[in-house]
């Protein structure tokens, strides 16, 4: 079990929050009939019952009311009818009722990540505006949007923005189109007008001692990844064959046993180190810090035993399944600081990518993220509850951290790494299963402080076309790996050596 499918069983009856509105509005030469637009909030429940983005216990009701009120105030010529739906069954039932309700189109707000509601509305043929509630629905928003873009669904339009006024402006397009197949292009024009202009890619200097492609290839053969809680997404075969990395699956019990017997005094010393490093500690006890430190020491001993330099664990599946008893987030953080790889969610593809980056750069592992795209700021935000605070490698400068709970379930210990700004970053996946390098880069510009979703949120202005950055999520999934440095040339040389396809996302 992982957090992507943990909420699959959660359900809530679709309810309606109808704001009374007049069916007519005054417009110039007389009264005209309002357009009727159904607003569908796609989510598990009004109050979130379990761990997922944005977080357990999150109350969506006031957010939905504010959104509906803003749409109604900003588009007085449209009657908005708000409803909730948790998946395709409820979405199809709403569609059936709407056949006799004179509904002209749909706004679908993705409030949780993976609820499949928008698909039914797009299939209706009516114009659909698909909007992301940032740091809440972003995974599904990216993956589902790229699928519709690949299929060139002309009645489908999208907007992801930290400014809800951008959603309101896009909704006004319901009044300006004559046919549903004009909707995508009409909203795209508005979205591009609302997107912040590029601010430039001039970055601070960052010298890196890089391996040659042939030396990198030999180094990869010396690396070994341990997977715990499964074989990893896409499986080990292509990673072994294409990248030369060794992969071994080991049981949860081995890691849990190593945690149990970790030296108590050393655990206290590691906890002391983290306490001194953190500029803030909130909702995490000293006992939990020592528990996390024991997990770090246990993982390090397991790596040593297997002569491995990378470990990836299906963390939440292990914790909720009672297989492990400490969150590994801080341990992963410390391993990455040391130039080893600690990676989340048993994501073998991204773990192998981190191994490739640290071998190329002499220890810059980067970090896995669940990205969010904010068109208002022209930013992609890399969000996760694990990241190093030595972005320039084990011997590089450090940056501040805050120790907080793991965000989605508000348990355990994880961290917010306040990463350096002004530097070029490289974001990739070494997609061995497809013999493809997925690549984009951009300037680190901010650390977003937002309680919803994962703790670390590095904001980057992409080098290139942010619109194009919407197009590959359905093919490669949500995760990306981001490392500091302009690594375009050496990575492209490696891809050519491997005879891989290069896909530039932006």
Give short role names for the model-derived ranges.
Residues 4-27:
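N-terminal export signals
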